[in-house]
Amino acid sequence: MTSPVAQCASVPDSGLLCLVMLARYHGLAADPEQLRHEFAEQAFCSETIQLAARRVGLKVRRHRPAPARLPRAPLPAIALDRQGGYFVLARFEPGADQAVLIQRPGQAPARLGQAEFEALWAGELLLCACAASPTQALARFDFSWFIPALVKHRHLIGEVLLISLVLQFISLLTPLFFQVVMDKVLVNNAMETLNVIAVGFLAAILFEALLTGIRTYLFAHTSSKLDVELGARLYAHLLRLPLAYFQARRVGDSVARVRELEHIRAFLTGNAVTVLLDVVFSVVFIAVMFFYSVKLTLVVLAALPCYFLLSLVLTPVLRRRLDVKFNRGAENQAFLVETVSGIDTVKSLAVEPQWQRNWDRQLAGYVAAGLSVANVAMLANTGVTLISRLVALGVLWVGATEVVAQRMTVGELVAFNMLSGHVTQPVIRLAQLWNDFQQTGVSMQRLGDILNCRTEVAGDKAQLPALRGSIELDRVSFRYRPDAADALRNVSLRIAPGEVVGVVGRSGSGKSTLTRLIQRMFVADRGRVLIDGHDIGIVDSASLRRQLGVVLQESTLFNRSVRDNIALTRPGASMHEVVAAARLAGAHEFICQLPEGYDTMLGENGVGLSGGQRQRIGIARALIHRPRVLILDEATSALDYESEHIIQRNMRDICDGRTVIIIAHRLSAVRCADRIVVMEGGEVAECGSHETLLAAGGLYARLQALQAGEAG
């Protein structure tokens, strides 16, 4: 089948081909011929593209944004040009010139200036998102992500709100108690009335303390539950992200973004609820204050615009400085993780002083950024405090004037002053809450980098049946980035069930990329990858990977026992099965010499074991679930000759009854293969047996001569 990009030159359906490109970008299989057949009677206008998108599992929404808002649109998207054709709008390049990266079907990606793009674009976008993804581009991550968890605990949250409401009513009684004491008890010397009021006041105080304690407990209880649920959802999403996400980001940066969830949760379940409730209930206090004195109430209300004006001025400054602070903190986190992960290299090169200077410089930058945020927050709090003090002075001066004129009693003035505090204090707290909200907004933006990324979701994809082991690559092309060169170019390859195929070539020739496409770690830009005749683009990736055994150049071992590391894919495997896999990988002998044998606890990444020992455990782990397809990606390149000899000695048993793909630099590792594929520049340069390729005198023969010369 001809790939969609190749067809573009002869087929005018640019909208169809753009849809196919975006479907494959989202990990969905889309056949242009099939879509053309299904919608043959219609031209591929925007409406038809929407119908066809639904057929392949995409949601498409028409959108006509202003040019200035285009960088905020969820990309990539399909754009309509002024000639009625379509192209893919990939992204806006950062920088002052705001270059736009686009791609037309059948052409290489192109960068356009802003003016060129606006001259080309007709003003319409087709926004695309994977219909199966819970975090798709049409539903960006925002506060609504937390609604399901909040709704689940709505009864607890409702109880908190009810208690807060009762506490507000109790606080309304306090000024009235003081007014009665000052205007009735003190003036009339009514001691019995004072005793009754004191008992009632004491009961109110005790009841208020009890309700406050209950509310604090409910807050803590609800927060703990939300921590567990939201953290679990975030971690599950993180595990479902494609490999490309992690390759494009530093580990420390991702960890820093995950930690932002705590800030958001603290904001949602902290003072935000009570402060907002206090602000809403301030309307009741204001109504009561009007009953006491219209003039004094206007003095208090005159300060409210000042609070909001202060927030309006300082918020943009605070937001920018919070962005800088987060970026500095993420850089520190990433640098710390890099240092700890590469401590062997740091110490072996004796670059500790250089690393210390780098850390000191980055830490100083972070502290300076934090200080700049604190300065803005301090300025805001100082301004709010100043305004509140001026309000108190105004209330005292105007109120005293009213008392002297006998338009108010002293008790009423005291009660009014207490009521005004219930209005100004929530506003002051709201100003602090606004600062917290800006911090939360930054946290939402950073966490959105994770949660807005599409996942490898099974959705309605079919489960792959038990494999026989046939593999076919049909004119497959792939590039890691839209603006990068092809890592694979028009590769076609068939592997029969039970066949052992070696793949060799220079570094960067596309060997490992080939196996990653077979694992569906990446999705081909053009062409198809089929296993047992099934297009792996339309099956659940987990059902595929469960049936593959993969050994990389460096096997990662985890902080658990040797047995648990081997049985990672089959936790219920018997000891007999674990030992059988270890024997097959040549690991049983050295495992028995460990202090506790198979129950020996390994350090992080197998600290304490040699590279060859770690690799043999990795091979045993790949064999434990008896995969029908085994991929050895440079699995023996880092082994010493003795360890490699052990693996090669068992290779016949390892390959028995399964399809095996061996990626290797050492040609001796693939000499026993049924067929050897030679890669060069992302293409299949040669293919044949060891003897045939040597006789051909091509690239394989030259590589063989080079390695023979090095060995000599």
From Swiss-Prot:
It comes from the Bacteria. Belongs to the ABC transporter superfamily. Cyclolysin exporter (TC 3.A.1.109.2) family. This is Cyclolysin secretion/processing ATP-binding protein CyaB. The lineage of its organism: Bacteria, Pseudomonadati, Pseudomonadota, Betaproteobacteria, Burkholderiales. Its main location: membrane. ATP binds at residues 505-512. One of its GO terms (biological process) is protein secretion by the type I secretion system. Residues 157-439 form the ABC transmembrane type-1 domain. InterPro entries: AAA+_ATPase, ABC1_TM_dom, ABC1_TM_sf, ABC_transporter-like_ATP-bd, ABC_transporter-like_CS, ATPase_T1SS_HlyB, P-loop_NTPase, Peptidase_C39. Residues 7-128 form the Peptidase C39 domain. Its EC number is 3.4.22.-, 7.6.2.-. It is a multi-pass membrane protein. GO terms for molecular function: ABC-type transporter activity; ATP binding; ATP hydrolysis activity; ATPase-coupled lipid transmembrane transporter activity; cysteine-type peptidase activity. Involved in the export of calmodulin-sensitive adenylate cyclase-hemolysin (cyclolysin). One of its GO terms (cellular component) is plasma membrane. It is found in: Cell membrane. Residues 471-706 form the ABC transporter domain. The chain crosses the membrane at residues 160-180, 194-214, 272-292, 298-318, 367-387, 390-410. Keywords: ATP-binding, Cell membrane, Cytolysis, Hemolysis, Hydrolase, Membrane, Nucleotide-binding, Protease, Thiol protease, Translocase, Transmembrane, Transmembrane helix, Transport.
